[in-house]
Amino acid sequence: MFLLLPFDSLIVNLLGISLTVLFTLLLVFIIVPAIFGVSFGIRKLYMKSLLKIFAWATLRMERGAKEKNHQLYKPYTNGIIAKDPTSLEEEIKEIRRSGSSKALDNTPEFELSDIFYFCRKGMETIMDDEVTKRFSAEELESWNLLSRTNYNFQYISLRLTVLWGLGVLIRYCFLLPLRIALAFTGISLLVVGTTVVGYLPNGRFKEFMSKHVHLMCYRICVRALTAIITYHDRENRPRNGGICVANHTSPIDVIILASDGYYAMVGQVHGGLMGVIQRAMVKACPHVWFERSEVKDRHLVAKRLTEHVQDKSKLPILIFPEGTCINNTSVMMFKKGSFEIGATVYPVAIKYDPQFGDAFWNSSKYGMVTYLLRMMTSWAIVCSVWYLPPMTREADEDAVQFANRVKSAIARQGGLVDLLWDGGLKREKVKDTFKEEQQKLYSKMIVGNHKDRSRS
């Protein structure tokens, strides 16, 4: 039989006491408040402390840059090229005026100087195109003491290096284990809780239990990210029989919204851990899961969604119409499918603060596990959520126009750039129709003017 020495026994006892104290603190200050939806203000105090540290770090770097007679790096938030919203015809007119006395109205034929317009546009796009930069992390104006964001902040003193090292210890040795424990607790409770609720007979009690199990587990998962969320205009929260649409930055958008409301999720059936969670959730709540073969069938998807929203007793559906994650600086084209089914749409704008941690999931660069590790080793996830008034499709509006109107409202409220480009360009090649459109505009300008002159 293995006997412990007195010293070994003391260490084991101290370790047991430490784990007991840690679990008790975890239960009292994080899990129980999450269950009841209350906060002791610890996260907000933590956020204010971080802001003071970041401000001090910025001052130190500015001083270091000044001593070396260098200018501290500042990102170009509005792009590196000043662009005026002018049409192709107006710009070519301007080029022709500056190059010769001929004007477009008098000379409908092609001029060699027209090439300069297309060359300039091509170079501008290569240097500062407004689409592809939406698929990479947003640049920071000041360093947040994360090594992954220290690409442009070079003037780091010894004090800053020590502070950064202390931050690494805190994030990886304290926050990461704590967050993993909370995430494991939240996911385990979600699977077990929804499975148990699934065996209850249908009725109000089952709905009540399902709602509170979902809210409790999502709130624990929110705390696993040290998420500090500010919800605005909560009287506009989505109601049964409607569709909640939001801009999409990250998979955690779902947790952010579901920790404040009760939604039916829409998505593809997965395997592995995600599949276990999906099967457990659908037992307690009427989520809409599609098989891989069904996802590409637009008519089947629309039919399932229409059947769901027509039943006013069912939960609002949560949908991200962009179809991919964008870096939270803009809102890109909304797919029209969810706007064709005639339901009331509840727009939601989500804006993250990248100063504490970048929530954007660059799926072409990072896998899910790597992404979650980056999230759990960030300082915090800070964001604001705005619930906008419900919107319905007008009589003279088609689905595309309605989708664009909702998108514009979300972009305006969240302070995001409203873009018409498809987020699918992250992975797909630009369609030839986009190139052909520019060719048509130019040929119409030349041929159209020539026809007008012939008629006269």
From Swiss-Prot:
Entry-linked InterPro entries: LPCAT1-like, Plipid/glycerol_acylTrfase
Tissue specificity remark: Ubiquitous. High levels in testis. Relatively high level of expression in skeletal muscle and heart. Relatively low level of expression in lung.
Pfam short name (any one): Acyltransferase
Designated name of the protein: Glycerol-3-phosphate acyltransferase 4
CDD domains: LPLAT_LPCAT1-like (cd07991)
GO biological process entries: acyl-CoA metabolic process; CDP-diacylglycerol biosynthetic process; diacylglycerol metabolic process; fatty acid metabolic process; glandular epithelial cell maturation; lactation; lipid biosynthetic process; phosphatidic acid biosynthetic process
Membrane topology: Multi-pass membrane protein
Pathway membership: Phospholipid metabolism; CDP-diacylglycerol biosynthesis; CDP-diacylglycerol from sn-glycerol 3-phosphate: step 1/3
Catalyzed reactions: sn-glycerol 3-phosphate + an acyl-CoA = a 1-acyl-sn-glycero-3-phosphate + CoA; dodecanoyl-CoA + sn-glycerol 3-phosphate = 1-dodecanoyl-sn-glycerol 3-phosphate + CoA; sn-glycerol 3-phosphate + hexadecanoyl-CoA = 1-hexadecanoyl-sn-glycero-3-phosphate + CoA; sn-glycerol 3-phosphate + octadecanoyl-CoA = 1-octadecanoyl-sn-glycero-3-phosphate + CoA
Family, similarity comment: Belongs to the 1-acyl-sn-glycerol-3-phosphate acyltransferase family.
Compartment annotation: Endoplasmic reticulum membrane
Gene: GPAT4
Activity regulation, free text: Inhibited by N-ethylmaleimide (NEM).
Motif HXXXXD motif mapped to chain: 248-253
Organism: Homo sapiens
Transmembrane segments: 156-176, 180-200
Superkingdom: Eukaryota
Sugar-bearing residue positions: 247, 327-328, 362
